[in-house]
């Protein structure tokens, strides 16, 4: 399994570890069987069946159990969720993977995972390493409130939470229709600043700017990352560039146990 790694440039506490893994030469299906061993992860990643929604799940683990399980559910999914796969994907999922687009945990050793190939992965952590979260920011989920729902599920005060914006398609590569712009402007007219007109009914959409805007409005001031372009960077997977043959990047975050 050949993997390239990107490490977030953020001032996370030493006990919080995070990375973006890109499997070279891979198609839509990630080699999960060797994923943990290759990356020396403390446990199997907690995969989600991402559906471009706003549902958040919490992962917990009973003492002695190897596999983390989703034990709590924060906020119901959007009406009609579950029919649409994230990033147009065909990535294989298991029946016990929850339909959700964000997850949180406060348990050291549990690895949260988000898969993307143009959409925006966002990682969160409390500055005391007490909890972490990971969210999938496709335009549907982002406009509908997946970031706000993720923050609502976290216990840490907003001023003690930091966010890192992972690799996503950049504005110059992401032309969208009126329906995308309208979805954001219906929530906040200020979102208009993240769209640049190209031709009638079409706009360049800045996912990074939209995420920062929503996070700032939710009380998050410590925001990092957000400068890559999956479409033009050959290291990164892009569904818009490569279509159904595109691979997936995996954003991972976990808490190390406290020193004894």
Which ranges hold each PLM region?
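Active-site microenvironment for binding and transforming phosphate-containing groups
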Residues: 1-79, 84-260
């Amino acid at each position: 399994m050949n993997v390239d790694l990107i490490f977030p440039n953020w001032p996370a506490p030493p006990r919080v570890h995070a990375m973006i893994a890109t499997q070279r030469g891979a198609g839509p299906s990630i080699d999960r069987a060797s994923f943990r061993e290759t990356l020396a992860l403390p446990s199997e990643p907690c995969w989600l069946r991402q559906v471009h929604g706003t549902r958040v799940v919490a992962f917990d683990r009973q003492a002695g159990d190897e596999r983390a399980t989703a034990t709590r559910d924060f906020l119901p999914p959007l009406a009609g969720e579950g029919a649409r796969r994230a990033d147009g994907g065909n990535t294989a999922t298991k029946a016990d993977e929850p339909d959700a687009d964000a997850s949180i945990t406060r348990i050291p050793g549990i690895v949260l995972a988000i898969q993307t190939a143009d959409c925006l992965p966002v990682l969160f952590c409390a500055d005391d390493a007490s909890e972490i979260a990971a969210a999938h920011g496709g335009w549907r989920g982002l406009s509908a409130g997946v970031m706000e729902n993720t923050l609502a599920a976290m216990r840490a005060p907003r001023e003690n939470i930091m966010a890192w914006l992972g690799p996503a398609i950049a504005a110059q590569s992401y032309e969208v229709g009126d329906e995308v712009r309208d979805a954001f402007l219906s929530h906040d007219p200020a979102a208009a600043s993240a769209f640049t007109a190209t031709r009638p009914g079409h706009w360049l959409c800045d996912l990074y700017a939209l995420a920062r805007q929503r996070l700032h409005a939710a009380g998050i001031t410590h925001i990092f990352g957000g400068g890559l372009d999956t479409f033009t960077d050959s290291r990164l997977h892009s569904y818009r560039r490569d279509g159904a043959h595109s691979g997936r990047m995996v954003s991972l975050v976990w808490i190390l146990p406290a020193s004894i």
